[in-house]
Amino acid sequence: MERTFLAVKPDGVQRGLVGEIISRYEAKGFTLVGLKLMVVSRELAEQHYGEHKEKPFFSGLVDFITSGPVVAMVWEGKGVVAAARKIIGATNPLGSEPGTIRGDFGIDIGRNIIHGSDAVETAQREISLWFKSEELADWSPTLTSWIYE
């Protein structure tokens, strides 16, 4: 089954949106297999955003993600990477559709509430960066047979 990495950023945690965000993925039928509240180290932030290292906004990304607690999560399910991105909405909240997390709660691109892996390969890299294998639960909810054929 496919897995993706999501992180509720410091603005989402401070605004009390963690429960709302988790509820959206549970209601969709995805399975939460990893969850932790953490303060992100500068080293982890720089690794996570490594692809943007030469871009002018890199230091701002690192400063923001390390500015407060983050809720890191791993979700599992059929097509979860693409579906999670649809639930999140466009990077710029002002361009996000109503009904998406960013469309409903975001205003500014620099405070866009949540990160989600953009591809299966990215998800695998991000999951291994943020979680040890023993921190991920291998389980199936009883409702799985009601969601998948």
Curated annotation (Swiss-Prot):
Query: Where does the source fall among the domains of life?
Result: Bacteria
Recorded GO terms, molecular function?
A: ATP binding; metal ion binding; nucleoside diphosphate kinase activity
Q: Per the record, GO CC terms?
A: cytoplasm
Name the Pfam families for this protein.
Answer: NDK
Q: InterPro entries under this entry?
A: NDK-like_dom, NDK-like_dom_sf, Nucleoside_diP_kinase, Nucleoside_diP_kinase_AS
Q: Which UniProt keywords apply?
A: ATP-binding, Cytoplasm, Kinase, Magnesium, Metal-binding, Nucleotide metabolism, Nucleotide-binding, Phosphoprotein, Transferase
Q: Give binding positions for ATP.
A: K9, F57, R85, T91, R102, N112
- BP-aspect Gene Ontology terms: CTP biosynthetic process; GTP biosynthetic process; UTP biosynthetic process
Q: Where is the active site?
A: H115
**Catalytic reaction(s) noted:** a 2'-deoxyribonucleoside 5'-diphosphate + ATP = a 2'-deoxyribonucleoside 5'-triphosphate + ADP; a ribonucleoside 5'-diphosphate + ATP = a ribonucleoside 5'-triphosphate + ADP
Names of the cofactor(s): Mg(2+)
Q: Which NCBIfam families match?
A: PRK00668.1 (NF001908)
Subunit (UniProt): Homotetramer.
Q: Which HAMAP family does this one have?
A: NDP_kinase (MF_00451)
Under the heading PANTHER family, the entry gives: NUCLEOSIDE DIPHOSPHATE KINASE (PTHR11349)
Family, per the entry?
Answer: Belongs to the NDK family.
Protein name according to UniProt: Nucleoside diphosphate kinase
